[in-house]
């Protein structure tokens, strides 16, 4: 039995967090002694964490700059001190440091958080994404081996943690396109870098898809669905424009999008500006998207960037006809015209592809047959 510390930000609904919950379950099944340490202990996915896992929150033992404290008010709870530390980080980043010295910013924030004093066999910074967890894992934990995860091929955030990544023994990338990008940035760390697909419990996805679905908003004879955070890389602004084009062509449909995110209100406003707020509906967060996926007619994913999109795996496991943007990470799962469809991320071409697929019943049946036959196996890397 190994003692393993897994680091995360929260357990809010998101692909990374879903994959982390599945990984925790896998580690428990292997009889490992697992602790999950979060920046903030919150989120709807906390209920998916096995009871055998000890779940804790980072302890912040210093308060932020007095000027910032006067702005946001005085608070004493651990979660609020965590908020303070992040607020101090943003303040220092913009005023004192800047992009080129982000590592120094994290070093300052590390002074405000208590170290993890236990000795572990393994530390996994599962969240990655240039988050504070990478700095914490590198400098505030003790373990024989440490690993960090890279979940996306767009590494714009790398400046935040590049000073800390060399302190990890393994760099796990969730797809080959991600691995290539990491090696391009860190050629000296190529021997530590390998692909390890996010583990997804397919049987659990299928079980959860059988749960009753009662949502008065989720109606219509022709339903499209997308699941994911409302952020720039997901391409939802393009989705609004595709919706407007399909409406102009006379197609009667509804496109539902499940997920919270920083761009949600902006996207709802954009839908109104394009006069498609009745056709593209941003549902916000749903704790269990699987029944929605099961009952949709097409699963659409117009992403600009991805790592190894878990939502595509889940849609495949439910034998849904998928149309996704033609980017490297999608090509790892989708073979155009065989087990799904790929399309350039262009409004007119995506609209054309949707109409073409809808008109081809025989092609859709062939795709579903292929999806029923092909295995989805993630066990090799977790043996």
Give each language-model segment a name.
Residues 17-22, 222-245, 251, 262-268:
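A conserved mid-protein helix/loop that constitutes part of the nucleotide-sugar donor-binding site
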Residues 177, 199:
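Carbohydrate-associated surface elements
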Residues 268-284:
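Nucleotide-activated donor-binding/catalytic signature segment of Leloir-type glycosyltransferases, i.e.
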Residues 285, 304:
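Aromatic "clamp/platform" in nucleotide-sugar-dependent glycosyltransferases that forms part
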Residues 314, 327-337, 341-342:
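Short acidic/histidine- and often glycine-rich active-site loop of Leloir-type glycosyltransferases
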Residues 321-324:
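Short hydrophobic beta-strand element within catalytic cores of glycosyltransferases
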Residues 336-337, 341-348, 356-361:
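Conserved acidic donor-binding segment of nucleotide-sugar-dependent glycosyltransferases
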Residues 349, 356, 363-377:
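A short, well-ordered alpha-helix in the C-terminal region of glycosyltransferases
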């Amino acid at each position: 039995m190994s003692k393993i510390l897994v680091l995360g930000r929260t357990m809010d609904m998101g692909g990374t967090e879903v994959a982390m919950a599945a990984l925790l379950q896998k580690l428990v099944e292997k009889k490992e002694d697992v602790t999950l340490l979060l920046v903030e202990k919150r989120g709807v996915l906390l209920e998916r964490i096995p009871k055998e896992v000890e779940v804790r929150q980072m302890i912040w033992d210093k308060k932020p700059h007095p000027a910032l404290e006067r702005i946001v008010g005085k608070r004493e709870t651990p979660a609020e001190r965590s908020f303070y530390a992040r607020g101090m980080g943003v303040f220092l980043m913009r005023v004192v440091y800047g992009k080129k010295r982000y590592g120094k910013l994290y070093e300052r924030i590390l002074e405000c958080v208590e170290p993890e004093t236990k000795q572990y066999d393994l530390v996994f910074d599962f969240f990655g994404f240039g988050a504070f967890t990478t700095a914490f894992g590198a400098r505030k934990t003790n373990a024989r081996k440490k690993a960090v995860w890279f979940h996306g091929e767009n590494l714009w955030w790398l400046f935040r943690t590049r000073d800390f990544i060399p302190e990890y023994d393994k760099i796990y990338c969730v797809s080959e396109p991600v691995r290539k990008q990491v090696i391009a940035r860190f050629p000296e760390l190529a021997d530590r870098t390998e692909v390890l697909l996010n583990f997804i419990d397919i049987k659990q996805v299928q079980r959860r898809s059988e749960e009753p679905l009662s949502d008065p908003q989720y109606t219509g004879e022709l339903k499209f669905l997308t699941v994911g955070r409302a952020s720039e890389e997901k391409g939802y602004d393009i989705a609004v424009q595709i919706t407007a084009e399909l409406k102009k062509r006379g197609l009667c449909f509804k496109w539902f999008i499940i997920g919270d995110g920083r761009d949600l209100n902006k996207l709802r406003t954009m839908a109104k500006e394009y006069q498609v707020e009745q056709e593209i509906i941003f549902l916000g967060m749903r704790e269990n998207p699987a029944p929605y996926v099961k009952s949709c007619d097409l699963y659409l994913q117009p992403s600009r960037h991805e790592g190894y999109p878990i939502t595509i795996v889940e849609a495949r496991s439910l034998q849904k006809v998928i149309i996704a943007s033609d980017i490297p990470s999608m090509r790892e799962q989708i073979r155009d015209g065989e087990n799904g469809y790929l399309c350039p991320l262009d409004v007119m071409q995506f609209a054309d592809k949707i109409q073409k697929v809808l008109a081809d019943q025989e092609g859709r049946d062939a795709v579903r047959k292929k999806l029923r036959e092909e295995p989805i196996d993630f066990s090799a890397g977790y043996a």
